[in-house]
């Protein structure tokens, strides 16, 4: 073999050696086959975890709002028990005024002064009630409302629409949007009928 032929064969041999060396490396660089079923399982698990996180967030927010509402209610209605006790004071003032007819006041300065003082006390007490969210329940002349009124009797009155409150025996009160005490009332019957609530006169 001549020197030139030997030189021509050497690059070919080196190229073959390099290909042989790169063969295993090229094969190891290829990405492993991934199980498509496993991918689906992982995707399902991720979706479930996302839903669980969203649910937990919603529950946390609902709990926070509920606690805030409870705290607000405790503040708004903390005086409920005291208010119910004080209502009897307003009742007694009203009874005292109702027991003195206007005719008895005429010509009696002492009695007039006394009733005027009681009226002022009543107005001041009701104004104090208002400041704390305690309000009188509208009753006289109103349509009977079982949510606000308690019917104690029915009164024959053809001139009034049936179910109209024609007598207030005891005032009712609300505290903000809650009923402290229903108004005890008498309601008309025998007059024109109007669609609405049926009146239950049972105590």
From Swiss-Prot:
The keyword Chaperone applies. This is Protein GrpE. It comes from Paramagnetospirillum magneticum (strain ATCC 700264 / AMB-1) (Magnetospirillum magneticum). Belongs to the GrpE family. InterPro entries: GrpE (IPR000740), GrpE_coiled_coil (IPR013805), GrpE_head (IPR009012). Keywords: Chaperone, Cytoplasm, Stress response. Residues 1-38 are annotated as: Disordered. PANTHER family: GRPE PROTEIN (PTHR21237), GRPE PROTEIN HOMOLOG, MITOCHONDRIAL (PTHR21237:SF23). Its main location: cytoplasm.
